[in-house]
Each structure stands twice: as structure tokens, then as C-alpha cells.
Amino acid sequence: MSGAPPPSSGFAPRSYGQQPLSHAPRSSMMSVEYDGIPLPPPSIRSCGSQQYVTSYIPTGAAFPPSSVQDMISSMKSYASATDLVRTYSEIPSVEEALSTLDRAAAALNARRYRDALKLYLEGGYAMANVAERQANPKICNLLTSKGFETLNWCARLCDWIEGRIKEKHPRPGVHKVGIPVSNWDEDWVGPFMDEEEARRMWYTPVYCPHPIDFSNLGYRLRCVETGRRPRLMICITMYNEGPQQLKATLKKLANNLAYLKEQMPGDEKSLTGAFAGDDVWQNVLVCIVADGREQVHPKTLDYLEAIGLYDEDLLTINSAGIGAQCHLFEHTLQLSVNGKCLLPIQTVFALKENKASKLDSHHWYFNAFAEQIQPEYTAVMDVGTMLTKSALYHLLFAFERNHQIGGACGQLTVDNPFENLSNWVISAQHFEYKISNILDKSLESCFGFISVLPGAFSAYRYEAIRGAPLDAYFQTLNIELDVLGPFIGNMYLAEDRILSFEVVARKNCNWTMHYVKDAVARTDVPHDLVGLISQRKRWLNGAFFATLFSIWNWGRIYSESKHTFVRKMAFLVFYVYHLLYTAFGFFLPANLYLALFFIVFQGFQQNRLEFIDTSEYSQTVLDCAVYIYNFSYLFGLLMLIIIGLGNNPKHMKLTYYFVGAVFGLMMMLSSLVGAGIFFSTPATVHSIVVSILTVGVYFIASALHGEVHHIFMTFTHYTALIPSFVNIFTIYSFCNLQDLSWGTKGLHDDPLLAASLDETEKGDFKDVIAKRRALEELRREEKERVENRKKNFEAFRTNVLLTWAFSNLIFALFVVYFASSSTYMPVLYIFVASLNTCRLLGSIGHWVYIHTEGLRGRVIDKSECGNGTGRYPQNSYVQLEEHYAALAEDQRTYASGRTNASVRTVNDVSSAA
């Protein structure tokens, strides 16, 4: 048999009835074959004007030419559409055909349905015609399939225009297209997966203005179609990183799957059966979300295409006329290292059409993909993060051992720290990361509240974050900044801190956070001071306002959550510590200045340096030393404020390096003088204890955790850069509070764009003039709104900057003129020693917690405590199956020719589900 049956409304396909998720056979997703060559798929009716088509398109041989000619000549199938349009002009090139379909999508968005029908019909015919002139079989078949799809859509759109379909706004249906991958190795497949899964990549253009409607609009991930439901989903966010970073991240994930596979069932430290054995890869789904099609590194796309996870031709042709916000590629990867094959990785590559933000990428991941899968656990990480081979195992083990844990993070470290010891910026960050893990996260984990689970590598129990916590997490995506204001806008620069707090304070729950030391991940960090300034601006602003938010809303833990009385009392202790630590950080620039002033320069002036006799110097020389110090320090601070207001750090690189070097020399001089004073004066118990609790804590805690060599090798680097961390980063951050580009740029639709799309330029002359005047008025109001928002944000920036600067200035002047070194320094030492004592006790407590795990497991069973059930949250997934069953029933109703049947809309079906 040759030729394809014309895709008419009366044709009933034989194997396209959608079944519930867990029962849909793979064969039902294939198109009808003739003489061994799959022909273009007929349309599938599922709901209103919507459709769901899954078709596999071969690329080795072209479709028979007669099938295309039969389709074009069968005009009776499109009689209604032709009567409406009555015009047809052949478009001679692929570029013009694609452009016509894009204009059709724009007309459809503007609700100019008859114009859209005309353009879709022209574009569909053009696709079918230009396909015959393509020498490449792959391009020929893709164009032919697109032509069939578009003309079928024209027939359905015509039915809607003439009132035969009841639906509010018609949209092209879901069309998932599969093509063979080029790098398939038939010798590799072996026992892990079948040939079909290994050879095929699937692409779906996604039109979904709101990701939460992904499932309701009929989109399905490939693993759902094949009856799989992964228990662990991993989100990898990507922006413009190179291919080497993505390659390293994926291979480290494959190593983690191999480690999970080798776990022995029944062992005391083994995971449940889903995360062990040869089929462990089927319970893990990796989602790579790229923020903007134009922003992705071209070589990264080349790498993705090489491994079968991207195809430019497929995207260009099949997304035409859809107006897709996201391009979805799905494939089970086959990676190898040095000829050794790794476990398969079920992978989804979501390429967003427009740049929005990392938060928007998480919005797609959580509300579209994870909401459909309903995994038990979900992890988030950045491209470039490299997990050690057992990192995922340790996180999953913590979740399975204690079902009260709602979120957990591993130990994040700097990549190749010892190879970069000559780079002081990298070494200082390595010290900071280590101390944060050893002291801060260990302390917070003892209380059950980790202030921030880093987006570079952390994991959550999906049950703990689904609902209210995620709604709060994505708040800035749904509400305009004019309404939120600058405080909340800056707070959401550290949205992961908000998510952590919302999980712990969740109403009627008692979730806790946990730090897993053995789950180690290496990450790439900024290599120079300028790059670090830009990064820390986002971190510091977000952390400061998020901390104020958590302090202000701490009462929710007591009034809304179901934590035990003992846990709430522990949170009260942590709240006091958190409050003192935040206050100390606010006045840290003044305290740093005062410490340098009293230790070095006033000691030099008053001959209090035991190892240097300054009595022989004239008073003028002694006073000049103090004046020079004050002038240099103040000049450096003023310079930082001036260049921080409205200047990009990249344009002031030399200035920042100069100021950082001056502050670094002052800090090193202070450290040497302080060491000289300590070793030249008689030792007392008080001085030894204070010294240990201020500086020795870093070495004691790191030695306890077996990482003291990291601290020894990078302590000098960090000491020299302390003034840069305190002064440069903080001043630049407060000088740019009005800049929220990291968390909010491009997150909101432009109302002017929507207005221009709705403008039809139809009607009489007066109507057109009135519409143009209305659009001009809208533009004027939008301009005023943007200017007012800019003024409000800049005023907020100025007020906060002045408050912070004058608070530190007044505090420093008060101490200098009304206190002495003998009064201030002991108070400072005791305060710092007290905070560090708390951190040390927390580090020791976490060390004891780790090394008594076996004993606690025999005494305390937390496998069924808390909110976790240890099972899937089945309710939502059952609703999803009911939703797709309803779509399948609508499809069968339409295909059987029962034209009088009541066809439900997508919203009606989702409400019923």
C-alpha cells in the first residue's frame, strides 16, 4: 500500500487511544507504517481543539512522494477551511514557510482567528511543498510531518470558528516528535534498556504560559508515557556555561548511579530496593533547564546534540507556529569514560525560549515537571557542580533513615583548591566554604534549621515543599515588584533561604533540615576579585533581608508548626544566637576598623606594643601614624562608596584591586602585631582561653572533622582578604540595593507587548485612531510606573545605605572618644569568643551525631516519625491518571463521530480530575 490517508476529521486512527499512565503501551505512540516506512501521523483528538500526537520520524529515508501529493490533492478534507480562506499562494522557501507559521501564531495570540487560519493554511501547504525539494531525507520528513500537523490543525481551527467545537481559546495540540539519535551504539544496550529507548530522542514544543498548567494542557514526559515514575528527580540549572562543565556534571551523576547500583540489599546501610540494582537508573530522572535559547553556549548545544539531547533542525521546524515558551528534549543518555560504559541516565533538556532567571528555571522544574512526576525526593544543582561518587547515596540515606527531614544539603567545596593556592581569591573562598561547613552548618543542623540550603547542591523531600513553601518560593514570579517593594525584592535574591524557612515553619508540620557531611560536591567559584564582588552582591543583599524576614516571622514556628516543645525551645536558643550574629554582622565594618586602630596604631602611639619601644619617637611622629591610618581607611571607604554607586565592577577593576591591597596590608600588619603582642607578654589563662576561642576554634573544629590541613594552607589567604569581604563586598552590595536583575529581570510579561498583540487594526477609521490613542496612553502610564518604581527603589537604597553607614560611623566614633582599648578590646574578644564557642559546640555536637549513628539507630527509630510516610504521595498522582483518562475518553468520543457529544474543555477536565 502506498500513500497516506488524508488527515480528515472522519478518519479514525487504529491505535491512538490514550490509556492511563501506568498502562499506555509504547506501540500506541507509533504512527501507521506502510511498506516498512512510517508515514506522517494523522491527527489525534483529545479535548476540544487540542490534540496529543506522538510520532516517530525516520531520517534515513524520505517519505514516499505520492503520500505528500495525495495529501495536497485531497482538498475535500479541508473544504470548510478552504471556503473560509479562499486564498492560497505557494511559498517557495523554507524560511518563508517558517515565517508564515510564526505570523500565524502571532495572529492566534492576538485572537485574529480567521487571519490565523489563512496563515496556517498557507504555511502548511508550503511545508508540504518545499519538503519535496529537500535532498536531505531528515529535513524532508520533518517538513512533511509538520505540513500534515499544520493542515490538521487548520481543520480543527475551522471547526472551532464555525461553532462545532466549544472551547474558549483554541490552541494547537501537543505534538511529540521522535527521531533517531546519531550516536547510538547497538553493542552498548545490553541488559539495561531496549533498542527503542536507546535509539530515539523525543522533542515537544511547549506552549504553556503558566508552568503549573503543564499537565492540564496535556503534556506528558516520556517516562510517564512508558509507565515509569522516578522516585528521585534532579534539576540542573544552566545559563551560559561551557560544555566541559556540563559534561563533568553528567558523568559525576552517572558515577553516583553506579554507586547506588552496587548497594547490597539487606545491608544495614543500604537504601530501599528502588535505589539499588541494575534498574536504579529507572528511578532517577535528570532535568537540565537552560535559561534562554540565545544565552546558551553554542558549544554546549553541540555537545548536547552529540549525546542525543538536542537537534536544531527538529526544534526549528516543529516549533514553528506554536509560540513555544519551552523546548523539551527527552532521551536516555549513554555516556562512557575511557571506553567504560556508564549506567543510562533518563534525561530531560528543557530549553526556555527567553531568558528569565534561575528562579524561573526552578519554576518550570517544580511546577511543570516535578508536579507531573510527583517524585519522593528532588535535588537541585548547578551546571559545573561535581558530586563525589557517594554524594547522592548519603543524601538519600539521610532521608530514608529519618522521615522528619524535609531538606538536606551536602558539603560544598571549591574545585581543585590545592592547585590554586597561588590564587588568593580562590584560596580565601576555600577557607570560607570549609568553615561554613564545619562550624555554621554543623551548628544549624543540631537545631534542625539550616538557614540556607545552597542551590548549587541540595535536596528536598517533595512532600515537604509541595504547596505553600513553593508558592512562597515563587512569589516574585506572580506579583509585580511595585506591589512587593524593594525589601521583598531584595529578599528574594536569596530565595533559597525563604524556602528553607517556609519548610521548617510550615503549618501543621514539623519538618527539619539536616547537613550531610559525607555528601560532598565540588563547585566552580569566581577566580578574581571582580567576579566575586558581583556574586557576593546578590548573596549579601539577599541574605541580609531574608535574615530579617526570618527573624520577624520566627513566631510562626511557635504558632503554626507542630514541632515538639523541646524542639521549639531549641529554636528559641538558636533565635537568640541568630539575632546576635546578625547584629554583629551589621556593625562588622566598624568593629574591624576599631580592632585595627586599637591593636596597631593606638598601641604604637601609646607605646603599648611590648615588642617595639616607641618612647623614643616624637609625639608628632606618633600622632601622624594615627592620622595616616585614619585618613587611608576613611579614604578607602569613601572611594568604595563612590565607585559602588552606579559603576560596574568590571570597569573599575584596578581601583578595587588597589583598595583591596591596601586593606589587605593593614590586616596582615594587624595580625603580625597581634601575634607579637601575644607571644611577648606573659601568658595567662584568660589570654590563652580567649585566643583559642577567637582564632583557635577554626583549627580545633577542622581537626575534629579531619580537615585541619585545609585550614592551615588557606588561613593566611583568608586573613588578608577579610577587609575585602567586610568592606568591599558589603559597601558594593548596599550601594546597589536597587538592582534586582539576578532574581527578577524578565520575570514579568510586558503589558505593552500584550497590548500590541491584542491590537487588530480592524474596524473603521475612528476605531483605529481610538485604539492607537489607547495604546499610546498605556505606554505613557507604563513609562511613569517604571520611573516611579526606579525612584522608590533608589530612595530605599539611599535610606538603607545611609542608615548602615551612619550607624557604623557613630558606633566607631563613640568607642574611639568615649572608650579605651582596655575597655573595648576585652568586650570584643568576649563577644567573638562567645559566638565561636557556640559554633564549636555545634560542630562537636554534629561530630558526635555522625559517629553515634549506629547506636541511635538501635535506640531511636525515626523511620515513621514526622510528616513523611516513606511512601509516594499517591493522591496527586491518581488525579493525574484520572485527568489523562478523561482526555482519552474525549478523544474516543470525537473519533467515533458522535458530533453531538458534549466535549469538555481543558479546564473542565482538570476540575473534574
UniProtKB/Swiss-Prot annotation:
Needed co-factor(s): Mn(2+)
EC number, UniProt record: 2.4.1.16
Transmembrane regions: 539-559, 581-601, 625-645, 658-678, 684-704, 711-731, 800-820, 825-845
Membrane topology: Multi-pass membrane protein
Outcome of mutating D382A: Abolishes the catalytic activity
Effect of W539A: Greatly impairs the catalytic activity
Subcellular locations according to the entry: Cell membrane
Name of the protein this chain belongs to: Chitin synthase 1
Organism: Phytophthora sojae (strain P6497) (Soybean stem and root rot agent)
Taxonomic placement: Eukaryota, Sar, Stramenopiles, Oomycota, Peronosporales
